[in-house]
């Protein structure tokens, strides 16, 4: 295909990937928040689902999760993995797709990264540089 006919891919994927990812995210978040998965670990944790990334063929969904407070992440991931077939079936019922996407659960580390950057910005060396930049303008 000539270059002028190629569509530019956004960082999160195509528009369809983003839309389907958001639909799957809502379905998983609703399922977890309403106690639809009968697992003592999952029932004992409040889990947020900030993002779902879909593969280009929409057959794989990477579900990013974060337990409230960021504690017990390994235990929560194991519980989600153990209940993956049930969650996949429940999501398939809520989402109208040709194929039920396979779910892959990952911990969302954006919060940790944002905190690390915030701490870095508060270091004396960076504060000094920022102060010098504001004095020059």
Curated annotation (Swiss-Prot):
Its main location: cytoplasm. GO terms for molecular function: ribosomal small subunit binding. GO terms for biological process: maturation of SSU-rRNA. Keywords: Cytoplasm, Ribosome biogenesis. GO terms for cellular component: cytosol. It is found in: Cytoplasm. The keyword Transport does not apply. One of several proteins that assist in the late maturation steps of the functional core of the 30S ribosomal subunit. Associates with free 30S ribosomal subunits (but not with 30S subunits that are part of 70S ribosomes or polysomes). Required for efficient processing of 16S rRNA. May interact with the 5'-terminal helix region of 16S rRNA. NCBIfam families: PRK00521.2-5, rbfA. This is Ribosome-binding factor A. It comes from Rhodopseudomonas palustris (strain BisB18). The lineage of its organism: Bacteria, Pseudomonadati, Pseudomonadota, Alphaproteobacteria, Hyphomicrobiales.
């Amino acid at each position: 295909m000539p270059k002028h006919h190629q569509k530019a891919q956004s960082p999160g994927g195509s528009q369809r990937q983003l839309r389907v990812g958001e639909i799957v995210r809502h379905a998983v978040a609703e399922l977890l928040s309403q106690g639809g998965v009968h697992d003592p670990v999952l029932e004992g944790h409040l889990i947020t689902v900030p993002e779902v990334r879909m593969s280009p063929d929409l057959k794989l969904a990477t579900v990013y999760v974060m337990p409230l407070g960021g504690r017990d992440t390994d235990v929560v991931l194991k519980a989600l993995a153990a209940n993956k077939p049930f969650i996949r079936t429940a999501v398939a019922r809520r989402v109208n797709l040709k194929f039920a996407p396979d779910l892959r659960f990952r911990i969302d580390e954006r919060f940790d990264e944002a905190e690390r950057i915030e701490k870095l910005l508060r270091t004396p060396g960076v504060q000094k540089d920022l102060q010098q930049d504001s004095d020059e303008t």
